[in-house]
């Protein structure tokens, strides 16, 4: 079957990486697992041998022959023919996620996962995206994505995966990442406002926090002059001269709360 470029289909063929993903997810016979993208079923079959239940969300119904083969062999596999971004994940009751993600939906699907309860997710991403997810302050990988994902999950970069592990071979390297869901390590008063502050700051990651916020005041929906007044009012409580890329997530959370109290 010819894979769909539109759907970003690159099927994971290398069984070593399939096994690595499953091992790092620590799947047991008590786990209910969510997988995105059936492919030819290489990952699904291995999951089904161990897990209590496997839900697979797949959009491409041309893959039905593979689905029929798997569901006839494994009674614990259920295929959901739909767009993963539109499925209500809260009703599925899974506790783990293992998936080779379509790279064009990496960001929205990751944040959709983080909005629901799960224990562990072991996911395949484009290499550069994975590095940014795991980015730490004062590194070139540190980004808005780093702070947003690490707000309520621990991120572990497991390994780099070469194009040769897939069919067809993608043009980029990939990586396996493990997300462990947890409660936030710091408090923010309003998560939506926190995300707006993040966006405003990281549009200018090399500038000082003050300059970045003023230049992107529209992102936090505060008039530029009003924002200048607010920053002057709270400058005794925060160091606005620090560069954005050096600022820890905890400090950004604290700043978000300071600004939120003033609007």
Swiss-Prot record:
Primary residence: cytoplasm
Protein EC: 2.1.1.-
GO molecular function, one term: rRNA (adenine-N6,N6-)-dimethyltransferase activity
Pfam family for this entry, one: RrnaAD
SUPFAM superfamilies assigned: S-adenosyl-L-methionine-dependent methyltransferases
Keyword Transferase applies: yes
Subcellular location: Cytoplasm
Residues given in the record as S-adenosyl-L-methionine binding sites: 12, 37, 58, 83, 100
Coiled-coil portions: none
UniProt entry keywords in alphabetical sequence: Cytoplasm, Methyltransferase, RNA-binding, rRNA processing, S-adenosyl-L-methionine, Transferase
Domain of life where this protein originates: Archaea
Cellular component GO terms, alphabetical: cytoplasm
Annotated family: Belongs to the class I-like SAM-binding methyltransferase superfamily. rRNA adenine N(6)-methyltransferase family. RsmA subfamily.
Reported function: Specifically dimethylates two adjacent adenosines in the loop of a conserved hairpin near the 3'-end of 16S rRNA in the 30S particle. May play a critical role in biogenesis of 30S subunits.
Protein's name in the database: Probable ribosomal RNA small subunit methyltransferase A
Organism listed in the record: Methanococcus maripaludis (strain C5 / ATCC BAA-1333)
């Amino acid at each position: 079957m010819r894979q769909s470029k539109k759907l970003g289909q690159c099927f994971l063929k290398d069984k070593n990486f399939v096994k690595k993903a499953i091992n790092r997810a620590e799947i047991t016979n008590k786990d209910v697992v969510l997988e995105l993208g059936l492919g030819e079923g290489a990952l699904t079959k291995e999951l089904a041998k161990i897990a209590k239940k496997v839900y697979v969300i797949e959009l491409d119904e041309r893959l039905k022959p593979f689905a029929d083969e798997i569901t006839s062999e494994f009674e614990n596999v259920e295929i959901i023919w739909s767009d993963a971004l539109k499925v209500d994940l809260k009703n599925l009751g899974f506790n783990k996620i293992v998936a080779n993600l379509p790279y064009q939906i990496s960001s929205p699907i990751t944040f959709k996962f983080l909005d629901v309860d799960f224990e562990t997710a072991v996911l395949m991403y484009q290499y550069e995206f994975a590095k940014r997810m795991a980015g730490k302050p004062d590194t070139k990988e540190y980004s808005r994505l780093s702070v947003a994902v690490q707000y309520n999950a621990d991120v572990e970069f497991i390994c780099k995966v070469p194009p040769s592990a897939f069919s067809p071979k993608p043009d980029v390297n990939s990586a396996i990442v493990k997300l462990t869901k947890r409660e936030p390590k710091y408090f923010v008063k309003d998560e939506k406002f926190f995300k707006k502050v993040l966006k405003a700051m990281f549009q200018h990651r090399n500038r000082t926090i003050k300059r970045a916020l003023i230049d992107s005041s529209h992102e936090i929906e505060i008039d530029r002059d009003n924002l200048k007044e607010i920053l002057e009012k709270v400058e005794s409580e925060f160091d606005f001269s620090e560069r954005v890329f050096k600022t820890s997530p905890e400090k950004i959370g604290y700043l978000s709360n300071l600004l939120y109290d003033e609007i």
